[in-house]
Amino acid sequence: MNIHEYQAKEILSAYGIPVPRGRVALTSDQVERAAKEMGGRCVIKAQIYAGGRGKAGGVKLVHHPEQAQDYGKELFGRRLITPQTGPEGLKVRRILVEEAVEIAREFYLSITLDRSTSRYCLIASAEGGVDIEEVVQKSPDKIHVLTIDPYTGLRPFQARRIALALGLSGTLCEDCVELMLNLYKVVLEKDCSLVEINPLVVTRAGWLMAMDAKINFDDNAIFRHREYPDMMDYSQLDTLEINAGKYDLSYIKLSGNIGCMVNGAGLAMATLDVLKEFGGEPANFLDVGGGATREKVAEAFKIILEDADVKGVFVNIFGGIMRCDVIAQGIIEAASEVHCTLPIVVRMDGSKVAEGKQLLVESGLNVQTADSLGEGAERIVGMLG
């Protein structure tokens, strides 16, 4: 689950991590008033669920309130397009107005999950303010990574080593140690999959400060934090993804024209790969899970068909826990209800597969069945030309 930068900074501030003074604005008039509070010279930052805002024109230094208001008018309602948004971009509905800070040095600091070790790892670099991926490619020696033992947690001596490796000393070194320990508390207590500060800066006055912040919460832990759903900005989410969430479906919109319904995340990823191998372009990632009911399958199929980009559907199901006849019933119910005329290819195997295929054949829908993943992928790609 994503949240906005201003929300991430509120959390960091509550844990004793210094952040710039700021106000959130919902109108250009509020931008002007906030700029006056900041003394006129301030930074205007569009709030969207994506990085790369600066290069897209979503971050600007202004020198007086009227200029801030004008820039607010320009930003509100505008779609920012960044490498993380896709070609459609994300609409700006909120703006963070922050005090301008004189910066002496910039660093990168984050704590994230390392899925290869199933542990949190702390990542730091003296190359802050840029995409960390660029630093990894161009200067991997400037990246410092520490895997954190879950039994002992992040220890002060480990944080001190990182701070020294960043070139900090004296009071700044000790301040950085305290900041990293507090950051680790945020990760644990808030059930985060990522907490990132980029850049973490040393100001001209000699203080550490988090100039930009990103926090992602672990979706599987949201039930432990009743306040999290209220923090979500649904205007930043795809409508189909919101609908999928209501039925506990894992759905991600992609840019192709082949709708996909699969059970199991691993099989879903493999399905996308094979479609690409045959020259197809998946329109979505959709995992219905291992124990989906007929109703859940029907809702999943409807969500796929709501996407105007979808020109054909590929269903790839392995019936272990799920029965193939239940899958077939859900597909038939949904396709009949919305009067689907799109070509559909279904590859099913496992429990009740013969019964499932028979139901599809007798349904009267534009459905073809396949006996393997490769055969099914090749067929739907061929049908769409």
From Swiss-Prot:
GO molecular function annotation: ATP binding; magnesium ion binding; succinate-CoA ligase (ADP-forming) activity; succinate-CoA ligase (GDP-forming) activity
The protein, known as: Succinate--CoA ligase [ADP-forming] subunit beta
InterPro entries linked to this entry: ATP-grasp, ATP-grasp_succ-CoA_synth-type, ATP_grasp_subdomain_1, Succ-CoA_synthase_bsu_CS, SUCC_ACL_C, Succ_CoA_ligase-like_bsu, Succinyl-CoA_synth-like
Function according to Swiss-Prot or TrEMBL: Succinyl-CoA synthetase functions in the citric acid cycle (TCA), coupling the hydrolysis of succinyl-CoA to the synthesis of either ATP or GTP and thus represents the only step of substrate-level phosphorylation in the TCA. The beta subunit provides nucleotide specificity of the enzyme and binds the substrate succinate, while the binding sites for coenzyme A and phosphate are found in the alpha subunit.
Lineage: Bacteria, Pseudomonadati, Thermodesulfobacteriota, Desulfuromonadia, Geobacterales
EC numbers for this chain: 6.2.1.5
Key word Magnesium present: yes
GO biological process: succinyl-CoA metabolic process; tricarboxylic acid cycle
